[in-house]
A protein has these predicted regions:
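Short "repeat-start/strand-capping" segments in structured domains, especially the N-termini
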Residues: 128-132, 149-155, 181-186, 293-296, ...
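Ser/Thr/Gly-rich low-complexity blocks that favor extended beta-strand/coil architectures
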Residues: 2-20, 27-87, 228-263
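Surface-exposed loop/turn segments connecting beta-strands in extracellular beta-rich domains
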Residues: 5, 119, 128, 139-143, ...
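Conserved small/polar residues in nucleotide/adenosyl-binding loops
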Residues: 337-339
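Short glycine/acidic-rich loop motifs that flank beta-strands on beta-rich extracellular proteins
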Residues: 120-122, 142-147, 164-174, 196-202, ...
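Right-handed parallel beta-helix/beta-spiral solenoid domain characteristic of secreted/periplasmic
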Residues: 1-18, 105-118, 134-138
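Small/polar beta-strand repeat architecture
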Residues: 68-119, 250-252, 258-295, 303-304
């Protein structure tokens, strides 16, 4: 079982509510303080006594999820937003006063996260092959969740993702997150519940075209602030090119000859065996289709998912069957780009 002593989603349960005041209960494993009318969560190292992190809940925290039993949904509302007075009333309780209380209900658990900051992973596979994961229980993961990147042949069987006792959130973001993998990805007979984002997310990577170095060579870049820091192309890989405006494919598949990576700058110069078509800078993206997997998801249950049950973006064959979806806030299955 994978557990966290102090999960990095910050949960506040509504235990009392009136027109101008709400009392919230915070799980026993989450340390916090109220100072200068600010609510700050933190976790201390048992070795150095220094904080691993601090997070001050504020009105800018928009990435919140309300857990109302198994009904879950994203919200812009926050326990601390518009609170003119915040007071610690017990070891695990906080009172917030408002001109008008936000429309939470008694029993609601409001789960907050550090906005867009996903600086790590709960579990991480990179450049691995023939991995088989079986009969694991995951109570919580930080960052991207369980991330597999540039791997080949992954199997996940009889896994259970559920929050630990006393908590409502099982992952800071996605549960199983597959980015740029090849061969197959098989996810079978597993249970997914209460993440802060998607249950399963399978996708490749688009690198933006910066400039042509010559007729066979292009400089590409990672643009998304949450992506980069790894080698995305290898000699012999097959690549497709898409227009950024409508994601239509350009004719042809291009074969990687060699690469020159600048990991820190999130750029790569790729030499291809074929001549490249004429392209305007920043108007096209390149995808390594060799690192798109065949996907199988079967016999799984999905419950209390605030976003998508399965988000699938691969141009290989996908088989999704025999699954059960309940209380999914967005599409149960969303397939993008490659249909």
């Amino acid at each position: 079982t994978v557990r966290y002593a102090s999960p990095t989603n910050f949960e506040m349960e509504v235990v009392e509510r009136s027109l101008n005041k709400i009392t919230y209960k915070i799980p026993t494993g989450s340390d916090f303080e109220v100072k200068n009318n600010n609510l700050t969560f933190f976790e201390k190292s048992p070795f150095s006594g220094e904080n691993y992190y601090t997070y001050t809940a504020n009105g800018e925290c928009y990435c919140n999820v309300i857990h109302r039993g198994d009904e879950v949904f994203r919200t812009l509302r926050s326990p601390t937003k518009n609170a003119f007075k915040i007071k610690k009333t017990g070891d695990h309780t906080v009172e917030c006063r408002y001109f008008v209380s936000p429309k939470f209900k008694v029993g609601d658990v409001v789960a907050m996260s550090r906005n867009k900051l996903r600086d790590n992973c709960g579990l991480f596979f990179e450049n691995c092959s023939d991995i088989f994961c079986e009969r694991l229980t995951v109570n919580y993961m930080h960052g991207f969740g369980w991330l597999s990147q540039m791997c080949e042949n992954l199997s996940f069987d009889k896994l259970t993702f559920k929050p630990a006792s006393g908590y409502r959130v099982s992952s800071f973001a996605d549960l199983i997150h597959v980015c740029g993998c090849k061969g197959y990805v098989k996810i079978t007979d597993s249970h997914f519940e209460h993440p802060h984002d998607d249950a399963i997310n399978v996708h490749g990577a688009f690198l933006r075209f910066r400039k042509a170095c010559d007729e066979r060579t292009a400089e590409l870049e990672f643009v998304h602030h949450q992506q980069g820091g790894y080698k995305a192309f290898y000699s012999g890989d097959k690549v497709k090119i898409y227009s950024r405006t409508d994601l239509s494919e350009l004719d042809g598949v291009y074969t990687v000859d060699s690469t020159d990576d600048n990991i820190d700058k999130k750029t790569v110069i790729v030499k291809f065996k074929e001549k490249l078509p004429p392209m305007k800078p920043e108007m096209y993206v390149f995808e390594n289709i060799t690192y798109n997997p065949n996907l199988t998801v079967s016999g799984c249950t999905f419950n209390a998912i605030p976003t998508r049950g399965i988000l699938c973006t691969t141009d290989k064959e996908s088989e999704i069957f025999g699954n059960t979806f309940k209380s999914v806030g967005m599409p149960d299955i969303l397939s993008l780009i490659h249909i």
